[in-house]
Regions:
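The feature captures the beta-strand-to-loop junction immediately N-terminal to the Walker
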Residues: 41-43
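Helix-to-loop junction immediately C-terminal to a conserved catalytic motif
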Residues: 56
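ABC ATPase NBD Q-loop/coupling interface
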Residues: 65-82
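Conserved ABC ATPase "signature" region
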Residues: 120-137
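Conserved ABC ATPase signature
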Residues: 142-146, 150
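Conserved catalytic motifs of ABC-family nucleotide-binding domains
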Residues: 163
Length: 288
């Protein structure tokens, strides 16, 4: 892996110099390697949504730098434009991104603006609509006739079709029922496995972060509170709870067991890890 995205001492202040001045992001630095799957978590107001809008130049930082493949995205208009193709952003509410007359035209919008030929655009539209489970007969429909879940699929397909180097997904499961969440989870994992794209998955749900991420960044009051593997982050579960964040249900159970004197490791975050620990505790084999 090599570094594809680098954030260096980034701060963002809204309404500078006014009575409403507010620092939303405070001196944040981190980098993302090519192919990494990163969960970015934090409670409402932690600064995560403001932060991600800098990655492709939608917001300009009050101070600090954003680099894509070693290039400052604000060094020129050309670099800022290139960043918008290199970093795909799916907002929490897909209706913010859908505007064309048909699903096909909406998914094709990004590839068309990249200057791709018609055959390549058509391939990308159809392939990525298939990945997100949209049938051919939907392509000629207006996206505004679709259900919320289908709109989410169209928004994902539109970003997938651009084949960005970095994909940022802001609460992609928000508002979906359990079946819809499972579908979106599967689409994202399939795309990641096929393309090796760097993915930053923004969520307030520790359950989703634990299931999907190989690395978790925790934000609190505009700065990074934690950055590590899921095991490293959930080993500090009590700090997470103090910061107003939840932890996976299985982690919470093991925290309670430890408080009651049971010799368990409360950093578990999957059912499989919990079962293995309980088997060891009983003197059994964790592989049984």
């Amino acid at each position: 892996m090599n570094e594809v995205l680098k954030i260096e001492h980034l701060s963002h202040i809204y309404s500078v110099g006014s009575p409403f001045e507010k620092k939303a992001v405070d001196d944040v630095s981190f980098s993302a390697q090519r192919g990494e799957f990163i969960g970015l978590i934090g409670h409402t107001g932690s600064g995560k949504s403001t932060l991600i809008q800098h990655f492709n130049g939608l917001l300009k930082p009050t101070s600090g730098k954003i680099y894509i493949n070693g290039e400052d995205i604000f060094q020129s208009k050309e670099m800022t434009r290139a960043a918008r193709f290199a970093v795909g952003l799916v907002f929490q509410y897909p209706e913010y991104q859908l505007f064309e007359e048909t699903v096909y035209a909406d998914v094709a919008f990004g590839p068309k603006n990249m200057g791709l030929d018609k055959d390549e655009i058509d391939r990308r539209v159809r392939e990525n609509c298939r990945i997100v489970g949209l049938s051919e007969d939907v392509l000629d429909k207006s996206p505004f006739e679709l259900s919320g879940g289908q709109k989410r699929r169209v928004a994902l397909a539109g970003i997938f079709a651009m084949e960005p180097e970095v994909m940022v997904l802001d609460e992609p499961m928000a508002g979906l029922d359990p079946a819809g969440c499972a579908d979106v989870f599967r689409f994202i994992k399939e795309y990641h496995e096929k393309h090796g794209t760097t993915i930053l998955f923004v969520t307030h749900s520790m359950e989703y972060a634990a299931q999907m991420s190989e690395r978790i960044i925790v934000m609190d009051h505009g700065h990074i509170l934690m950055d590590g593997t899921p095991a490293e982050v959930f080993a500090r579960s009590e700090e997470l709870i103090e910061a107003g964040l939840d932890v996976p249900q299985v982690t919470r159970v093991f925290l309670e067991l430890k408080k009651r004197g049971v010799p368990v490791d409360p950093s578990v975050y999957t059912v499989e890890q919990a079962v293995a620990q309980l088997k060891k505790l009983k003197g059994g084999c964790a592989k049984c």
